[in-house]
Amino acid sequence: MESLTLQPIARVDGAINLPGSKSVSNRALLLAALACGKTVLTNLLDSDDVRHMLNALSALGINYTLSADRTRCDITGNGGPLRASGTLELFLGNAGTAMRPLAAALCLGQNEIVLTGEPRMKERPIGHLVDSLRQGGANIDYLEQENYPPLRLRGGFIGGDIEVDGSVSSQFLTALLMTAPLAPEDTIIRVKGELVSKPYIDITLNLMKTFGVEIANHHYQQFVVKGGQQYHSPGRYLVEGDASSASYFLAAGAIKGGTVKVTGIGRKSMQGDIRFADVLEKMGATITWGDDFIACTRGELHAIDMDMNHIPDAAMTIATTALFAKGTTTLRNIYNWRVKETDRLFAMATELRKVGAEVEEGHDYIRITPPAKLQHADIGTYNDHRMAMCFSLVALSDTPVTILDPKCTAKTFPDYFEQLARMSTPA
């Protein structure tokens, strides 16, 4: 297996313009494909997950052109639901941001489509979404294991009164919200259970509004969506920087700044993960906000005990930042780490122990006490981009760290290690 050893880093300083947000990129691509008119998307993320969405749209007859660096996409919308000619199989890798929304959108009309992906995708639950779509009339079969992909979709979704479980993934609700306006009938979506990662629903609603569709949101418990609507292209749309990707650089600034400035997100950003900066501030770093930048300056870091349900992806970065904080850090209400690219609670606990931390792994929490001195270890990444990027921070000590399968960052940030090196002064 390929590996990358990062030597100790004395200081991290400088600015980085962030690649586009994965969450925004894949939502914008799907809405542009469903919309009337041509949309020009700029600062699109070039990554595995976005390529899977683009390949799927192409197979569904959507025409688009990409710039040489794949960050600008001119896409001609279909002016309504996507149609497959004949039976189609779409391979979506491990891209939840493609699998979940497409599973819903392709239930409009009368298609026959199979959605499949990598082995890990077949372990990521989708049963709650399928149950909700079936309530709206969709014909869906599981081809292997009940409640998991691959799925066969045979259209049939018309809207109506639908319940969705909000406790596992906000992507299920996102998928229903984006599909419902194109259903022939009105849809009432009721959320049962605690809604996880609520800020991601705000991204969805924000983008739907940009494409001309507004819905009634009753305290995130019930959404009322008029049927028979159309999405309309906004013309040009700038994808904001990825706030989850910003977390690694901001944390590096907190641990070993200098000052690190990330551009492409700021106080006006719609992504909930910008709140990660508030957590660093609570830990002792100094944060400066602009409309389109966030800067972080080193501080004396101390442990925190916090509910992280609102920023689950960025919370992973706090777990490795905790190695540099005084005291024991507790991250709570993060059960949905277990159904991501890997079981992130298990993976994080396992790898933190390798570098010497004392770790308590609960059903939905993790408690981390840093060692007096970090140990050099080979870090397993579990084919999970965020594991690789989180554990790069270990090099901000006087100990090297070896990252196994470093190229797994291609899911959201192909040149992450080059960018980190560019801003780092070796010890």
From Swiss-Prot:
This is 3-phosphoshikimate 1-carboxyvinyltransferase. Monomer. It is found in: Cytoplasm. Its main location: cytoplasm. One of its GO terms (biological process) is amino acid biosynthetic process. GO terms for cellular component: cytoplasm. PANTHER family: AROM/DEHYDROQUINATE SYNTHASE (PTHR21090), PENTAFUNCTIONAL AROM POLYPEPTIDE (PTHR21090:SF5). Disulfide bonds: none annotated. Pathway: Metabolic intermediate biosynthesis; chorismate biosynthesis; chorismate from D-erythrose 4-phosphate and phosphoenolpyruvate: step 6/7. The active site is at D313. Catalyzes the transfer of the enolpyruvyl moiety of phosphoenolpyruvate (PEP) to the 5-hydroxyl of shikimate-3-phosphate (S3P) to produce enolpyruvyl shikimate-3-phosphate and inorganic phosphate. It comes from Salmonella typhi. It catalyses: 3-phosphoshikimate + phosphoenolpyruvate = 5-O-(1-carboxyvinyl)-3-phosphoshikimate + phosphate. HAMAP family: EPSP_synth. One of its GO terms (molecular function) is 3-phosphoshikimate 1-carboxyvinyltransferase activity. InterPro entries: Enolpyruvate_Tfrase_dom, Enolpyruvate_Tfrase_sf, EPSP_synthase, EPSP_synthase_CS, RNA3'P_cycl/enolpyr_Trfase_a/b. The lineage of its organism: Bacteria, Pseudomonadati, Pseudomonadota, Gammaproteobacteria, Enterobacterales. 3-phosphoshikimate binds at K22, S23, R27, S169, S170, Q171, S197, D313, N336, K340. PROSITE patterns: EPSP_SYNTHASE_1, EPSP_SYNTHASE_2. The keyword Transferase applies. Its EC number is 2.5.1.19. The keyword Translocase does not apply. Keywords: Amino-acid biosynthesis, Aromatic amino acid biosynthesis, Cytoplasm, Transferase.
